[in-house]
Amino acid sequence: MADHIDVPTALGDNAARQLANATKTVPQLSTISPRWLVHLLQWLPVEAGIYRLNKVKNPRDVRVACSQRDESELPQTFVDYDEAPREYFLNAVTTILDVHTRVSDLYSSPHDQIKEQLRLTVETIKERQESELINNPDYGLLANVSDEQRISTLTGAPTPDDLDDLITKVWKEPGFFLAHPLAIAAFGRECTRRGVPPPTVSLFGSQFLTWRGIPLIPSDKVPVEDGKTKILLLRTGEKRQGVVGLFQPGLAGEQSPGLSVRFMGINRNAIASYLISLYCSLAVLTEDALAVLDDVEIGKYHDYPDTYK
């Protein structure tokens, strides 16, 4: 008996797709994060890439008196300044982006190849910027915590008592905690263990855990080594004498504060080059604007008895 052969009676899917237009997304970059630290800092423009931080010398030597309704002699005083204040110099996060003109000429529909290459490169530069704000050995947050503002955990895992102790170090208008997401999860477990689940607050359209009304801001740029990390507490703003970000205004090819994109030309291989630079730094105006909780263990879990039998 002859094999039965199916004869199509209508146009098939595979053939029909040849006439259809697929909706194409722009390239998705998994390393992009919200970069909350950059959003929460106050950014100050600097002149010539230099920020000089003047401080009062021996502030407790300034003498004042409360009048006792008599003719006693009033104190004489003056406020002295440091003669060698620290100067912060802007740091550059930079790269050169190369795009072949053939690629940008032929394959820029529906998405502009140059625009997408620039967007993805700028996002990567901004991620590096946040990492430098935390980890840079010169101006980063972790490198600028004074010894008096460092404490260690009581038992290893971050407990409510640890964060309370941290608040005592930055008690004047604390802004937010900054921690790795794993550290925030570890703190949440310790709160659950004690029956005090932390409340949440909505910022920038996202939900954040809080402690004593202070939000815990996550950043994957806070280092984790050997199962341990750190939790920082910041006060921000120039008027509060807190932590501030620094940038250079008025750059050639400025795209956003401190970010410059400049066309460098086309070489003999028909490759167009773009110089992308982001100039930034960070300053801690007073020592009590920043504190850190060291030796935070992130791998501690708890077993709970089954009470639902």
Walk through the language-model features, giving the residues of each.
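Extended, solvent-exposed, turn-rich assembly/linker loops in the middle of proteins
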Residues: 145-208
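Sequence/fold signature of self-assembling virion shell proteins
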Residues: 199-309
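Alpha-helical scaffold segments that mediate packing/assembly in large oligomeric complexes
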Residues: 94, 98-173
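Intrinsically disordered, low-complexity linker/loop segments enriched in Gly/Pro
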Residues: 75-81, 86-101
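N-terminal "assembly arms/tails" that initiate or stabilize quaternary assembly
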Residues: 2-84, 286-288
